[in-house]
Amino acid sequence: MLDLLKQTIFTRDFIFILILLGFILVVTLLLLENRRDNIQLKQINQKVKDLIAGDYSKVLDMQGGSEITNITNNLNDLSEVIRLTQENLEQESKRLNSILFYMTDGVLATNRRGQIIMINDTAKKQLGLVKEDVLNRSILELLKIEENYELRDLITQSPELLLDSQDINGEYLNLRVRFALIRRESGFISGLVAVLHDTTEQEKEERERRLFVSNVSHELRTPLTSVKSYLEALDEGALCETVAPDFIKVSLDETNRMMRMVTDLLHLSRIDNATSHLDVELINFTAFITFILNRFDKMKGQEKEKKYELVRDYPINSIWMEIDTDKMTQVVDNILNNAIKYSPDGGKITVRMKTTEDQMILSISDHGLGIPKQDLPRIFDRFYRVDRARSRAQGGTGLGLSIAKEIIKQHKGFIWAKSEYGKGSTFTIVLPYDKDAVKEEVWEDEVED
């Protein structure tokens, strides 16, 4: 019995010790769990701070209760979503900046108070503001429209404005400005966008078109009036042998001049519409020019009204070039004819030619009337004449130099004139030249053989 009692007491004490040890273990585990939770909470808190700071690279990996695990996984997912969103925003920003940078139109944006928050380089150049800080400046001040418009006008009316501006090079520009509102999804207006389109060339072309139509009308009206007058005189009975032949001759001359003008206009139209193409061939340019000058020498013997001397001032060596011989003949003929027309009787006309590494330079000089300084920049304009009455009397259409300029441009060259009034003029043509072109062609032929 005693032994049984002792055994019972021992068992009871052992159970008590186990319970005590179990309690201590539970308390210890709870304390450890609480400490681990605190560490994990600190890690989660740090992760949130990293997200706020823009660091999305760290990934949490925690073991524990389901709630902690869920929070950790959600934070990792949120971090990845934010990272991808940030990358997309950066890519869109770069794409937008690239588009704005390469746009030929100027673009600027404002906040709701009309202050500039964005402007591209084109707009800065158009407004002459490259070196100025324009952010936060008023759009009204920037466009110089504060005297005529208020910000409310731009918002409520979104007008289209035509402005005169001066770019960074001091060139005057015509700008067409269009406005658009920046709206949020709620409809709240948060600012304006203005697009500046340079219409300088368009306005210039429109002015030239109007002037061209006016000139064509005038140039055709003058000979038509003459022809009409003479035909009316003939119709009314002026058919006697002493008068009628002169009337008919003048009518034919004016008709021929109109035909030449129409032909020149059609030629220019084909060039403008890019339907006039060069038929190039490889020729000896020295022989080509010499042939033209020989033709003019033969004409000189038949010319009764005007005597002139053609001087060749160039070496007789081969200059091989690819040109359209018909069109280039038209250019040289026109310049030589003008030199003869405006030179005094017995005048000297000098033709010079030389080459550089990559250019052929042809110049034709005369000692004629010359061109006034104020007229020199416009002599290649269509229908422009220094002396309209004299040019018309000599049968000119006023289009010869315009056509010459366009033909030279088709050959990727350029033409200009220097002149001193009363002393003469020099017309210079520069064409691209490759001195090795013939060597290469001969070498290719030898290889093919």
Swiss-Prot record:
Residues 215-435 form the Histidine kinase domain. It comes from the Bacteria. Residues 1-13 are extracellular. Residues 92-158 form the PAS domain. Its main location: membrane. Residues 157-211 form the PAC domain. It catalyses: ATP + protein L-histidine = ADP + protein N-phospho-L-histidine. Residues 35-449 are cytoplasmic. It is found in: Membrane. Autophosphorylation is decreased in vitro by dithiothreitol (DTT), perhaps because of disruption of disulfide bond formation and covalent dimerization. GO terms for molecular function: hydrolase activity; phosphorelay response regulator activity; phosphorelay sensor kinase activity; protein kinase activator activity; protein kinase binding. Changing E33A: Reduces transcription of the peptidoglycan hydrolase pcsB gene. GO terms for biological process: osmosensory signaling via phosphorelay pathway; regulation of DNA-templated transcription; signal transduction. Residues 35-87 form the HAMP domain. The keyword Phosphoprotein applies. It is a single-pass type III membrane protein. The modification Phosphohistidine is found at H218. Changing R221D: Severely reduces autophosphorylation. The chain crosses the membrane at residues 14-34. The keyword Nucleus does not apply. Transmembrane domain is involved in signal sensing or transduction. May form homodimers. May interact with serine/threonine-protein kinase StkP; the interaction may play a role in regulating Walk signal transduction. Member of the two-component regulatory system WalK/WalR that regulates genes involved in cell wall metabolism. Functions as a sensor protein kinase which is autophosphorylated at a histidine residue and transfers its phosphate group to WalR. In turn, WalR binds to the upstream promoter regions of target genes to positively and negatively regulate their expression. Required to maintain expression of WalRK regulon genes in exponentially growing cells, including peptidoglycan hydrolase pcsB. Phosphorylates WalR and also capable of dephosphorylation of WalR. This is Sensor histidine protein kinase/phosphatase WalK. The gene is walK.
